[in-house]
Amino acid sequence: VKTFRTIHVVKQPVDRVYEAVRDRLPEIAAMLDDVESVRMLERKAGAGGGLSLVNEWRARLPLPRVLDDLVHKDSLGWIDRACWDDRGRRCAWEIEPLFLPGQIRCRGTTEYEAAMGGRGARVTFAGQIEITLGARGTIRGPLDQTVSSVVESIVTTVVPRNFRKTLDGACALIERPSRS
């Protein structure tokens, strides 16, 4: 199990950042270089002001050649299941890659807190990834470690980097004048 954590502070009020990321993710995704699209599959209101969202992400990432036979372009993406707690400004999430199903577990939380005297937001994105390639029989031998290392690198480097870009996109949407 490998853990990752990143903290970002942005110059927008925490409630506006939280709501933009929760409610406008497909718009924000259009601003991300590594993301082709985000499509909402499910949105359910939960008890106590919570919200459950399921999104399908499609990525456009250059992959190492070692993954060519394992990851086809049409499976380069993931399902994101998120439970948003509006009272605590917290999101618990789980990512299920479309490639190597059942062999990669990635989950974590995103916490939104007021910063800069209420004029900004401090966002903590943290999680863990567990890869069990050889245990499922799909990949065995020396390739197992290579693929595990590449997938770990993508999740622990690309995902947090894209989260920073997601926050930047949310701030850009907040700053845009409304078209009403």
Predicted feature residues:
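Soluble, non-transmembrane catalytic domains of enzymes that act on hydrophobic metabolites at membranes
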Residues: V1-F4, H8, M40-A45, L98, ...
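Hydrophobic ligand-binding cavity/cleft-lining segments
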Residues: V1-V66, H72
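A conserved amphipathic terminal alpha-helix motif
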Residues: R140-S180
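Hydrophobic, Leu/Ile/Phe/Ala-enriched alpha-helical segments that form helix-helix packing faces
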Residues: L25-I28, L32, A82, T166, ...
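Helix-adjacent hinge/juxtasegments
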Residues: P62-D86
